[in-house]
């Protein structure tokens, strides 16, 4: 097996719950996925699907006293991150495993110069015993890599636009050249033209540094442009996964994936109304029985309401749906 086809990260049967004062929220339910070296996997789904909770669990950042892992493993290069003490996890977080959060506006400390914020990461993980001058040189290098003039490193976050703030966040995330980067909706707060610039930059840096990446998004266009594989999440579960070709060019899809594609406006077809997925996403504190998507599914049968769907695989393409298990699809 080549190095590129070796799993760097393996999530096995992971389940995560949040306990509030009144409700038990089942945010992630028996999720399994793997990311190979130098590979980018897109994690797609509506708001509330469990994507961010999955990412925060990988990073060891679940809120204490509320979030709880109830089962499963997160293996990074063979080490179960869930079994590590917080002090040991600190050695991984930021150095070999890094994350870009959704909103660059709130990810930076407003009273510390941006260059100092990049330098802090290098100082925290200074296993190469870099001198202050070498750290300053590395900060300059990272700023150049993300397209920011190094002389701006003494400025504060409020002096940067949203797109430039996100570039600073990316510089922080990649400063220690992590093996895996988790990007949680990295372009949501940015204008469309800036989104394209940031995505192109991230893709270029990924190739340059040899980094694996998990791209969390609800934008299928971003997935098609940047990812090698795709996992579609609904109600805390992965309902379909496969290569980008399987998802975007294949003929068989989970009904939820069909709904996601159907809700995208198309320029080649004249229409008066968009086609949203009917109904609301399942309440994670009161999940439907059987297939969690059955209340919104146009193909739902009585079996779907009472039995969890099996995983049906064709090569790397996996769909969790009774239709394909029974061969009922058209």
Predicted region positions:
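ABC transporter nucleotide-binding domains
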Residues: 1-252, 319, 325-330
């Amino acid at each position: 097996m080549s190095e590129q086809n070796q799993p760097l990260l393996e999530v096995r049967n992971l389940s995560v719950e949040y306990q509030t004062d009144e409700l038990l929220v089942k945010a992630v339910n028996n999720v399994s996925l793997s990311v190979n070296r130098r590979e980018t996997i897109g994690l797609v789904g509506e708001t509330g699907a469990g994507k961010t909770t999955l990412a925060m669990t990988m990073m060891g950042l679940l809120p204490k006293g509320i979030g709880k892992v109830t089962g499963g493993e997160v293996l990074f290069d063979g080490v179960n991150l869930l079994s590590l003490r917080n002090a040991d996890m600190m050695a991984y977080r930021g150095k070999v495993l890094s994350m870009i959060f959704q909103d660059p506006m709130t990810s930076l400390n407003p009273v510390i110069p941006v260059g100092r914020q990049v330098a802090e990461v290098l100082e925290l993980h200074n296993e190469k015993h870099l001198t202050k001058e070498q750290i300053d040189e590395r900060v300059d290098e990272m700023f150049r890599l993300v397209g920011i003039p190094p002389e701006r490193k003494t400025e504060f976050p409020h002096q940067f636009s949203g797109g430039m703030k996100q570039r600073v966040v990316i510089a922080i995330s990649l400063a220690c050249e992590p093996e895996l980067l988790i990007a949680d909706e990295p372009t949501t707060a940015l204008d469309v033209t800036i989104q394209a610039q940031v995505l192109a930059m991230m893709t270029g840096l990924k190739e340059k540094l040899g980094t694996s990446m998990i791209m969390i998004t609800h934008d299928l266009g971003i997935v098609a442009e940047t990812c090698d594989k795709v996992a579609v999440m609904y109600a805390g579960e992965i309902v379909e996964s496969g290569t980008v070709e399987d998802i975007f060019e294949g003929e068989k899809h989970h009904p939820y994936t069909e709904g996601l594609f159907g809700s995208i406006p198309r320029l080649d077809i004249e229409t008066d109304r968009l086609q949203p997925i009917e109904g609301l996403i399942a309440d994670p504190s009161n999940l439907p029985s059987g297939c969690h998507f059955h209340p919104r599914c146009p193909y739902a049968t009585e079996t779907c309401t009472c039995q969890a769907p099996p995983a049906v695989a064709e090569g790397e393409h996996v769909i969790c749906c009774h239709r394909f298990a029974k061969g009922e699809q058209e």
